[in-house]
Amino acid sequence: MSDQIKFIMDSLNKEPFRKNYNLITFDSLEPMQLLQVLSDVLAEIDPKQLVDIREEMPEQTAKRMLSLLGILKYKPSGNATDMSTFRQGLVIGSKPVIYPVLHWLLQRTNELKKRAYLARFLIKLEVPSEFLQDETVADTNKQYEELMEAFKTLHKEYEQLKISGFSTAEIRKDISAMEEEKDQLIKRVEHLKKRVETAQNHQWMLKIARQLRVEKEREEYLAQQKQEQKNQLFHAVQRLQRVQNQLKSMRQAAADAKPESLMKRLEEEIKFNLYMVTEKFPKELENKKKELHFLQKVVSEPAMGHSDLLELESKINEINTEINQLIEKKMMRNEPIEGKLSLYRQQASIISRKKEAKAEELQEAKEKLASLEREASVKRNQTREFDGTEVLKGDEFKRYVNKLRSKSTVFKKKHQIIAELKAEFGLLQRTEELLKQRHENIQQQLQTMEEKKGISGYSYTQEELERVSALKSEVDEMKGRTLDDMSEMVKKLYSLVSEKKSALASVIKELRQLRQKYQELTQECDEKKSQYDSCAAGLESNRSKLEQEVRRLREECLQEESRYHYTNCMIKNLEVQLRRATDEMKAYISSDQQEKRKAIREQYTKNTAEQENLGKKLREKQKVIRESHGPNMKQAKMWRDLEQLMECKKQCFLKQQSQTSIGQVIQEGGEDRLIL
């Protein structure tokens, strides 16, 4: 800390500050003086900060310094609580806060000067988005941004030129070299002219060469124009694709949507736009006009000092107290009449505030949605340029994902069924093979037994008869089964219809009960909601009344406190006057002449006598001046006449000297006569 203070003191003692501090005087600086030192250091970095803080409010001083420190990117150590401590310390001029700031500023003064200079031109003026809807404002803002970019480019070039080390001597040397080269080129041109003039048809050759140069320039211009048209065509194709995608998305949205939903959405948009145009925007415009009027009024008025501001604050407090008293009188007078209306008014004000808040939220959401759509379109264009494929939009992507999920589940189920069927097929195939082998063995055994008994072919004939009888029985059974199935199906249908009727009867009865219960619950919900709204409005009104009462009591407390301070000041003044009167009485009663001379009465008596003597002398002087005024005026007139006479003689003498003599001047007895 001591090294920090020493560095600050040494830097302040040097140019351009020249404070002549030592450790004792610097450490004994008061908070106001320390803030003035900080303001002087900031003024060295930014000349706009050259302010006498005694003529500035503390809040304005802190705001000005904090804004400049923010531009200079000063970061005090600590968290949010330390930041609040830093702001408070900057307001009151705390040394633990001011010393690190001074040390940081004085360490990098030149760098911060450059940063403050650039901040004047590179801090962008934020324009509200609703103002940018105006074409004039948008064009001006665009021009402003272009000028800012041009300034950045020029500043970079300036810095590069400073780093490159070009000097005026080198530039002059280059200029002289270019002039010499120009002279050489002129000589070469003259030499070539002389050589060409000797050739035949040199004028025609020069004309052809000139035409060739013009055509080459025209060819370059056409190539450049061709490239520009290619770029325009590319941008137009991109724009066409973007518009086609928008049209496709709109058609899909229109195809997916119903007319009722579209009409409902359009009605909501119309209501919202109507509210914005008829209520919100006129209010904001009126508020902005009032604010502009007040600001113009403030700008037109002369600058006010601290005393004027205190006087205005006292007037504002008096007017506020009068307004509160009038409101209280009005409330007391109109309480029985407007008791019921106040509740509805407060409810209406609460609803209007909620409506405005929701409108602002909706406007912000729309702006955010528009920005996200612009960003998404940019990303889609980048993706299309990268791999040439279309990017699915939100709804399309959701449908694609859902379709893919459903197909995936179906695929998994089918795959599982196929695996089960494969396993079952393998098992059945093995069973079939075993049964075939067993059947073949049994057939071989049967044939051998028939051959042994001498009745070969009997089993085959028996099998054929059984097969034919089985087929006949199957056909008969199928016919009977068909009739039975038809009659059974009719019975089932009748029974199913009766069951559904009975089941639906209970369901319909239950549905009626549920509908009735729903209506009762809806009615109860509406009643509870109205009770809640009225209770909330009543609580809101009570809260507003309590806030007004608290505000009024605080104002009364402030008034009583100011009245208390005023009374104390008056008491002190009266005590001083009483002390003076007591001292005067003591001096007047005292027998000491020296004490009597100190009395104010004696001093006033003495001053009165002196003034009377002075008035008497002045009256005598006035009398003398009045008596001598007439002769003096006469004497002054005689002197003026004498002066005119001498001037006339002078003119005559000069005329006599300059012209030829046309007469004779005779002097006799102190008189001059001119004889022509």
Swiss-Prot record:
Tissue expression profile of the protein: Highly expressed in testis, moderately in ovary, heart, liver, skeletal muscle, kidney and pancreas, low in prostate, brain, placenta and lung and not detected in spleen, thymus, small intestine and colon. Isoform CDV-1R is abundantly expressed in testis.
UniProtKB keywords: Acetylation, Cell projection, Ciliopathy, Cilium, Cilium biogenesis/degradation, Coiled coil, Cytoplasm, Cytoskeleton, Differentiation, Disease variant, Phosphoprotein, Spermatogenesis
GO molecular function terms noted in the UniProt entry: tubulin binding
Disulfide bonds listed in the record: none
GO annotation (BP), single: regulation of smoothened signaling pathway
Assigned GO CC terms: centriole; centrosome; ciliary basal body; ciliary tip; cilium; cytoplasm; intraciliary transport particle B; motile cilium
Highest taxon of the lineage: Eukaryota
Region (CH (calponin-homology)-like region): 2-121
Positions of post-translational Phosphothreonine modification: T61
Keyword Metal-binding: no
Subunit architecture: Component of the IFT complex B, at least composed of IFT20, IFT22, IFT25, IFT27, IFT46, IFT52, TRAF3IP1/IFT54, IFT57, IFT74, IFT80, IFT81, and IFT88. Interacts with IFT74; the interaction is direct: within the IFT complex B, IFT74 and IFT81 mediate the transport of tubulin within the cilium. Interacts with tubulin; the interaction is direct. Interacts with IFT57 and IFT70B. Interacts with RABL2/RABL2A; binding is equal in the presence of GTP or GDP. Interacts with IFT88. Interacts (via the IFT74/IFT81 heterodimer) with RABL2B. Interacts with CFAP61.
Known disease link: Short-rib thoracic dysplasia 19 with or without polydactyly: A form of short-rib thoracic dysplasia, a group of autosomal recessive ciliopathies that are characterized by a constricted thoracic cage, short ribs, shortened tubular bones, and a 'trident' appearance of the acetabular roof. Polydactyly is variably present. Non-skeletal involvement can include cleft lip/palate as well as anomalies of major organs such as the brain, eye, heart, kidneys, liver, pancreas, intestines, and genitalia.
Function (record text): Component of the intraflagellar transport (IFT) complex B: together with IFT74, forms a tubulin-binding module that specifically mediates transport of tubulin within the cilium. Binds tubulin via its CH (calponin-homology)-like region. Required for ciliogenesis. Required for proper regulation of SHH signaling. Plays an important role during spermatogenesis by modulating the assembly and elongation of the sperm flagella.
Name of the protein described by the UniProt record: Intraflagellar transport protein 81 homolog
Gene: IFT81
